[in-house]
Amino acid sequence: MNSNSTLFVRNLAFQTKQDDLTNFFSDVGPIKHAVVVTNPETGENRGYGFVTFSMLEDAQRAAKELKNKKLHGRILRLDFATPRKRSEVDTDQNKAVKKTIRQDNRPRLIIRNLPWSIKKPQHLEPHFSKFGKVREIKIPTKGGGRMCGFAFVWMKDRKAAEEAMNSLNGTEIDGRPIAVDWAVSKDAFEATTLKDASSEEENKEFVSDEGHSIVTEDASADSESEEEVDGHSEGKELAGESEEEGSNVDDVEDSGDSSSDKNSINHEIRDNEGLEDTVFVRNLLFECTEQELYNHFRQFGPLAYAKLVKDPATDRSLGRGFIKFRYEKDCQNCLEMASQLPTQEPTEAEKRFLPSVLVDEGIDTDSVSSRFLLHGRLLKVTSAVTRKEASDINQKSLQERKQKMGKGVDRRHLFLLNEGKIAADHPLFNSLSETDKTLRSQSIAQRKKLLEKNPTLHLSLNRLSIRNISRHIDPKILAMLGRQAIRGFMDDVSKGLRANITEEEENLDKGHRLKRGKSGGVLKQAKVETEKAGAGRSKGFGFMQFISHKYALMALRWLNGREITVKKIIDAEIEWARKHKIPEPQLPNIDYNDRPRRLIVEFAIENIQVVKRRQEKEKSFRQKAKQLKQQEDEDNLKRKRSESDVEDNEAKEKQAKVARIIQRKRMKRRSRKN
């Protein structure tokens, strides 16, 4: 780079791109090029860049005029770029010493136990920028873009880094406690790990002041399996342990009550043994120690151990623990007394506020509840379960809570993206052409991208997208194909060629199904998209809408990847009509090249706003139709009334005429007699 006409630009915002830098400096004068230095791994910019002007005067003017100007909300720092000078007389030893000193002094922090919501440096920067300037943030990922759960933060100076570490260590980000520490080199980390591994067996157990064996926390617990647990339900909270403390739930073998055994605990993991004498305790004070827990539960009988459940990242208590009794009868007695504790469902008003973890002050000290009071908290005691049972209960209760709260429900039906996908192990995969494989893979990628970008889009439960159809297929023939798909699927099921729709799939849209049409069919609509210009030529794709998800799923699984021709559709329809002795439909003659096409069938992507407008339009149309029908009925009634009135008048006139004739005849008779 030409140092005379090149500016070194610092303090760039993370979202600043090369074009933004070019546009910002081009107002001063012509620019040869502008570069934003990025991280080759993540693609995020490092917060600095270079701008090279065509003229030296423009570079000097830019350094003066744009100094302390803001770009994307950050004040730029401008200097003339100079080549990096390297000393050629440095020996290898001096370089190694300088590198060590530089690494030891650079203010880099490691943040562990990050929540999965922290995916980009911008998400983490606000937490550290209040302590000083953040130079760089790296968030490593695994294969497939999965997060590793930790990150590195490089602060401008060591004082700011130290202040950030002291302030943020142990705090929560998105409900998850983080651990902040100085970052060390990989070699130093591996050396420390080996040293810790060699002394692990020696530190695996220790003895309390009273001689009772206390089991240490298993540091190998997986922090990724933690789940937040609501404190209202017994069964739900028990499941909160998940796999994190799976080894803690297991049996710790007790070889007797001799004094020599108090200093030795066999920490073998046995999933299905020894849980009859173990209880699980919740609602503990975070500051509660294992010794305090041990001393409190000794009132129920001799104990083997008392153990707290700790966060492996911060080594802090999670407010839960395990108590193992020496005798099963003492454990059962404790559980029986715990079952007598008062349980009261919160009122609707109480649900609006956080539940109190403290017991009422007016509690009777002689009651059962007083035996489960520790640090002013009423403990919740239940039976301990194995890791597998805890995981099953946790998953079940988590789903129940999410459904009650309206969370975790796939309202956009994204799981339907996999329907219609022909994987490499599918029987049809080898029969697909390379073009067909490419089209399908591109379609999946495009659909995923659309759904990620626009949250108003969702996958329809009963509407299918049919692509790669012949341009000679009109809505009438497409409707025939839809009906044939349902019949074909049911025939395959009866012959044992394919599995039927499951009960869960059948009830997926329960309460949201469409009404059958006048014909009583399951196909609600068949539509072929046509070009607006010209004679309305088909675009080669269309849509089918069924009355329920069940029939849409049947049609998709039968049609997807199937080769069809217009002749096959027409012949199948004629055969069906003859078999069931119904009039054959009037079908067009095939006088064109009817080559086979393999269908691509997927659940259609719909916009919730468009769907709402369509529903409102249909509702308005139905209301208008109803009003027109009512008006027509009223008009018919009026017409009938008027017609009946005319008929009544005619009848009355006729009767009057007859009466007059009779009266005249009577008058004539009387006149003759006289």
UniProtKB/Swiss-Prot annotation:
InterPro entries (alphabetical): Nop4_RRM1, Nop4_RRM2, Nop4_RRM4, Nop4p_RRM3, Nucleotide-bd_a/b_plait_sf, RBD_domain_sf, RRM_dom, RRM_dom_euk
Gene3D superfamilies the record matches: 3.30.70.330
Chain positions found as Phosphoserine: S223, S225, S242, S247
Gene Ontology cellular component annotations, sorted alphabetically: nucleolus; nucleus
Nucleus among keywords: yes
Family annotation (CDD domains): RRM1_Nop4p, RRM2_Nop4p, RRM3_Nop4p, RRM4_Nop4p
All copies of domain RRM, residue ranges: 5-83, 107-185, 277-386, 486-579
GO biological process, alphabetically ordered: rRNA processing
Compositional bias of kind Basic and acidic residues: 230-239
Compartments, record wording: Nucleus, Nucleolus
GO molecular function: mRNA binding
Disulfides per UniProt: none
UniProt keyword list: Nucleus, Phosphoprotein, Repeat, RNA-binding
Bias type Basic residues, positions: 662-674
Top-rank lineage group of the source organism: Eukaryota
Region (Disordered) location: 194-270, 621-674
UniProt biased composition (Acidic residues): 219-229, 240-256
Alphabetical list of SMART domains matching this protein: RRM (SM00360), RRM_1 (SM00361)
SUPFAM superfamilies, per database record: RNA-binding domain, RBD
Name under which the protein is recorded: Uncharacterized RNA-binding protein C4F6.14
Species, as recorded: Schizosaccharomyces pombe (strain 972 / ATCC 24843)
